[in-house]
Amino acid sequence: MQRRFMLLSLAVAATLGGSTTLAFAADQTMNVDVCVVGAGAGGMSAGMAAVDAGYNTVILEKLGVIGGGGNFMEGTFAVGSRLQIKDNVGINAEKQFKRVMDFHHWRINGKALNNWLKETATTIDWLEAHGINFEGVHTAFIDGNRTWHMFEGGHGSSLITNFAEKIEAKGGKILTSTPAQSLIIDKDGTVRGVVATNEDGNKLTINAKAVIIATGGFSCNPEMVKKYLPYAGYESAGSPGRTGDGVQMLEKAGAKLVNMNVTMQAGLWLKDVPTELQFGKDGLTGATYVRLLAALFQPYLKVSPKGDRFADETLPLEYISNAAEEIGGEAFAVFDDNTRKEMINVGLPRGYFGMVAPGTKFDNFDKLFAEGVKKGFCYKANSLKELAKLTGMDPKRLQNTVERMNQMTKNQKDDEFYKDSQWLREVKKGPFYAIKGSLRTYATVGGASVNEHFQPLTPEGKVIKGIYAIGQDAGGLYSDSYDMHIAEGTASSWAINGGRLSVEHIKTYLKK
C-alpha cells in the first residue's frame, strides 16, 4: 500500500519559493478581480485558472508557506482519463456515479457529484497541459478501483510549486502570513471582498469581484471537532492550519452547512503520541514509533475500552474508523507472546502506507514496546486479569472475548464478524500485550452546501452571490464516510476540480 501522506518539513522545503509575505506599516486596500482564500491544492488550482483567464488575482495564505494539504497528496482521483483509457481501466463517469451514490445511499448532492465526475478527466488533461506529470493510475487496495492518478515523484508539492511559479509569472500575487479575517458583504448579501491582516496585525481590505474559499476544513480546531465530529477526541494527522476559518466565514455569509460530522478518516493511531513520532517529519526522519503504529494496524484482535471485540479487524480505514467511533473512538490491539514472536521472526504481514513494508521483521519490538510502556500507550502483563487492570478493561469481558477468539481460531472460523480465517490468532501464551489507539483524521470533509458550480447555498437553497466554496470547505460529497475504498483521491480531486470549475463559472458570473 502506498504511503498517502508526506509530512511537513519536506513539503515546506519544496514550497518556500513562489510566495510573498506582505509587509506594510498601515492599513491598505487592494482591488482585484478574484481573491482566493487558502493556498492549498484547491486554492492554487483556482489561482492558476484565474490568471489563465486574465483575472487580476490574489491568493491569501495564513501560514508562512504555501501548499497546505496539497503538499501531502500523492495522487488525485479521475474517471475516464487519458491514462485510464490507455491502461484499459473500464471506469467512466456513469459507472462511478452509480457506485458512489449507492455507497452513500443517495444522501449526497447528486447533481454536484455528476458534474464533478464528468470534469475529472478534463482536469487531468488541464494539469498535464500545465506541466504536471503522472506516473500512472493505481489503487491501494486488492479489490479497489483504479482511480488514483499518482503524481510523478509520488507527492503533490510538484503541483504547488509549478502553479506558484506560473501564477506569479502571469501577474498573480500569493501572500503568505496573511490570514483572511472576514468577508465583505453588501446589503443584498452579495460577497464583495475579504478583510485580512498581515504579520504585524495591519488590515488589508481586498475588494474583489469574486471570492473563492479554500481553507481546508476544520480538523485542527478542537472546539469545532468537539462540536461536529462523532468522536470529540479526533486529532489531526494531516496538514496544519485547518482551523475552520473558511467554514465559519461561509456560515456567517448565510451558507447552510452539511455533512459536518464526516472526516477523511486515518484509522487508529498510538494514543497521545505526537504524529511526527509515529509518521516522521518528512515521512521517515523521526518516525520513532512507526513500527508500533504498524503493529496496531495489523489485522489481529482489537477490543473496546471495556474489553469487547467490535469489528472485523481487516476492514478498510473508513470502516474500522466508523466502528471505533461507535465504541468511543479508542481501542486496544491485544495479542500474546506467540504473536509477538511472529512479528519479530516472521514479520508484519500488513505494511503501513509505504512506511513499513509487508513482511518487515519487527526486530526492535522489545525495545520500542518498553518505551511505549513507560509513555503509557503500551501494556504488558503476565495474565489477562492483570492486563485488564492496567488498561482499565473489564476483566470478565476481556476474558470472554479472548476465550471466544481462541475457539474461533481453533475452528478456523470467525462466526462473529466473519474475518478471513488466515488472520485469526490465539491469545493464549503469556506475557500478554496491548497497544492503545485513538482515532485521527487527515481532514474534515463537511462544509457549505454548494451547487454544481461550487456556489454556496442558503438553507432555503438560494445562491450566495460573489463567493465560491471548494475542497474541504464544500460539503455534499460524502454522507457519513469518506469513500476511499471505491474512489481513492477524491478529496484532492474535489479541491483541484473545484478550483478550476469555480473559475469557469466566474467567467459567466462576471459577464452578467
Mark where each language-model region is:
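C-terminal structured subdomain/cap of oxidoreductase catalytic cores
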Residues: 28-29, 47-49, 55, 349-350, ...
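Conserved redox-cofactor binding core of oxidoreductases
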Residues: 118-202, 221-224, 270-271, 279-280, ...
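Conserved N-terminal/central alpha/beta ligand/cofactor-binding core
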Residues: 56, 62-173, 177-179, 302, ...
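Glycine-rich loop(s) and the adjacent beta-strand/alpha-helix scaffold that form part
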Residues: 199-202, 206-276, 488, 492-501
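An anion/pyrophosphate-binding glycine-rich loop and adjacent beta-alpha core
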Residues: 247-249, 256-390
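Beta1/beta-strand and adjacent pyrophosphate-binding region of the FAD-binding site
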Residues: 28-42, 58
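A glycine-rich dinucleotide-binding beta-alpha-beta segment and adjacent secondary-structure elements
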Residues: 182, 397-481, 485
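N-terminal secretory signal peptides and thylakoid transit peptides that target proteins
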Residues: 1-11
